[in-house]
Amino acid sequence: MGLQMSHELPVPPAAAADPKAVEIARIWASGGAQHVSLATEIWDDPAAWGLMLVDLARHVANGYEQAQGRDREDVLRRIRTGFDAEWKSPTDVATGGLVE
């Protein structure tokens, strides 16, 4: 059984209602760094993670639009700018290993 955190986000209703739903990623901000837990075995082709990341960016843009009234396309452009900048000149190095 995992640690229950007070700052944990809620499970989306559709996922909670689906007995076949699988969590694929968790990301925490802690101590000035990101810490992740990933279900890397979920897809055979790593390109599927690229599709998921684009879908995630769209969900983030929708969230900014709904919560702050920001233009969805502007938000997506800012996300892409940040993604491209980090890809070109990483500000951090991914470390760590698989934890079971």
Regions found by a protein language model. Give the residues of each.
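Solvent-exposed interaction surfaces and binding hotspots enriched for charged
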Residues: 2-100
